[in-house]
Amino acid sequence: MSEKTFLVEIGTEELPPKALRSLAESFAANFTAELDNAGLAHGNVEWFAAPRRLALKVANLAESQPDREVEKRGPAIAQAFDAEGKPSKAAEGWARGCGITVDQAERLKTDKGEWLLYRAHVKGESTEALVPNMVVTSLAKLPIPKLMRWGASDVHFVRPVHTVTLLLGDKVIPATILGIQSDRVIRGHRFMGEPEFTIDSAEQYPQILLERGKVIADYEARKAKIKADAEEAARKIGGNADLSESLLEEVASLVEWPVVLTAKFEEKFLAVPAEALVYTMKGDQKYFPVYDNAGKLLPNFIFVANIESKDPTQIISGNEKVVRPRLADAEFFFNTDRKKRLEDHLPRLQTVLFQQQLGTLRDKTDRIQALAGWIAGQIGADVNHATRAGLLSKCDLMTNMVFEFTDTQGVMGMHYARHDGEAEDVAVALNEQYQPRFAGDDLPSNPVACALAIADKMDTLAGIFGIGQHPKGDKDPFALRRAALGVLRIIVEKNLNLDLQTLTEEAARLYGDKLTNANVVDDVIDFMLGRFRAWYQDEGYTVDTIQAVLARRPTRPADFDARMKAVSHFRTLEEASALAAANKRVSNILAKATEPLNDIVHASVLKEAAEIELARHLVVLRDKLQPYFADGRYQEALIELAALRAPVDEFFENVMVNAEEKDIRINRLTLLSKLRELFLQVADISLLQ
């Protein structure tokens, strides 16, 4: 069977830069699945993405599906014909479905009887016939939140489509996709190269687009070029470019022919906090800031043009003129804001609503102030500083700088607090209260900041759950999942002695009578334990390990983490599977027991050597392990409990639990309950698979 290279390119208006990669990757994944489902043999599926195109190139694509033999078994002969030998309705219906008559059917004889049988040799469909619908289906499944239509057409796509190139080898596959007739026409760069040209074969892509169209269609190659050229440009001016992955991806999605240039701004702007300057350079202008080797911002920036200019100084000058007013605004806001103390903004917080039922930002500030102080007392942080940080926590939201550059919230609070002479840990806490903002983000660096960050998040969790507006499906407008995971990460990774039960109770208490959900505390804790499940799964822990710990519902996150590590280690022990099975057996036996058990195991009632030996081990371990449990040394405890494998095996091998004599039976059930209680001090290992 012959194989050819296949190419599909969808030429569009400028695609959303932040979605470009996901669109291309989804297109490739969808189309690959279509090929596999159709049984079309193929080689590597390579995707290409640039601002005005999505493309796929498939190596070694078979020109048709393989032929296949089809067999369909029909009714048994006894049901296929009546007493007179005439075909039954069932037989005729089956034959019609196969496209034959009953007389044309073969017969299949087996040891179990005889059936009608249809056999056919089905010729595989051509790739040319199959591919158009595959492309249409793959495009329809792209993750596009909002479609648009253009002109008089009722076709919908993420952006207007101008060209559809569909080639199998050197042949155009005729099709109409997104309202456009397929062809071999490709559009080049808007201002460089050839604006439009034809491609002779799929093999020529993307090289022909590079040479004639001045477009680097390979997304990763374009991104790598920007990164390398920006690093070199920064090195030439004695600095290091801030090439954050997200901005690098966005810029790579904005240009077809990247040209890296260096520009500068007045040094006077460096008196403004670097974060504000960086925010406007990266967020508004898509520029890469440059730092010296000490990490200090330089009065330079790197940007990427989408054209090779005969006079690059004009482009550089233009970008400098664009950024200058933005930096001047930041300078003005900074100087204006410093004329007031942070504390002076407190009254204005009363004018901003946090949530309709939960009050204003000033109300939230008062709660955070109290809760941060309470948390500080629990974890050994400075209570006065935590309380002060809570009071000032939202004041920077009322400043000109944060109003204009919203992402500088927190960090500007820190700078203004330092200007006001606040304690350093208070100032730092104002910046770090929102950490961690995302998975893998840094945690607050000092105890006061930890107290404030936890207080802010717990206040939101208690409040929103308290009015019954918990997250549903993908909707989480108050980012409660992120808040819950942030609290857990801080407590676990900083090893803070906090209990979710008392923490949530205190957060809910501070709302007074505003909360309508009587189960708010349990609901918040259950939600946070659910976040634990997701976190540990991401960390590579098995589901049954997580379930074993969750069954005990530990509400101290640091304690939960210690149990997780202990059970995970226990699973590696040779005795683990046998003891897990034994615990499951014990759990089932106790669940079926209907008689009340004894408080203790009565040694005088023990008869068999195996039960006497098991009881002896339990007494020794119970006394030995109490300090382990009290100190959270769960891993050591489970290692000790692993020694019970032999006596437990002996017990089940030689002892009849449900003895006829009631006192013996109840004593043995009590013995098993004591065994189970020891393991349950750590986790329910009966849930381990």
From Swiss-Prot:
Q: Which PANTHER family match?
A: GLYCINE--TRNA LIGASE, CHLOROPLASTIC_MITOCHONDRIAL 2, GLYCYL-TRNA SYNTHETASE
A single Gene Ontology CC term? cytosol
Q: This protein's superkingdom?
A: Bacteria
Tell whether Nucleotide-binding is among the UniProt keywords: yes
Q: Which organism is it from?
A: Salmonella paratyphi A (strain AKU_12601)
Q: Which family does it belong to?
A: Belongs to the class-II aminoacyl-tRNA synthetase family.
Q: Which reaction does it catalyse?
A: tRNA(Gly) + glycine + ATP = glycyl-tRNA(Gly) + AMP + diphosphate
Q: Which InterPro entries match?
A: DALR_anticod-bd (IPR008909), Gly-tRNA-synth_bsu (IPR015944), Gly-tRNA-synth_heterodimer (IPR006194)
Q: What is its EC number?
A: 6.1.1.14
The UniProt GO MF terms for this protein read: arginine-tRNA ligase activity; ATP binding; glycine-tRNA ligase activity
| Compartmental location | Cytoplasm
One Pfam family cited in the UniProt record for this chain: DALR_1
| Quaternary state and interactors | Tetramer of two alpha and two beta subunits.
List UniProt keywords, sorted A-Z: Aminoacyl-tRNA synthetase, ATP-binding, Cytoplasm, Ligase, Nucleotide-binding, Protein biosynthesis
Give the transmembrane ranges: none
Is Protein biosynthesis given among the entry's keywords?
Answer: yes
Q: Which coarse location class applies to the principal site listed for this UniProt protein? A: cytoplasm
Biological process terms in GO annotation:
arginyl-tRNA aminoacylation; glycyl-tRNA aminoacylation
Under which name does UniProt file this protein? Answer: Glycine--tRNA ligase beta subunit
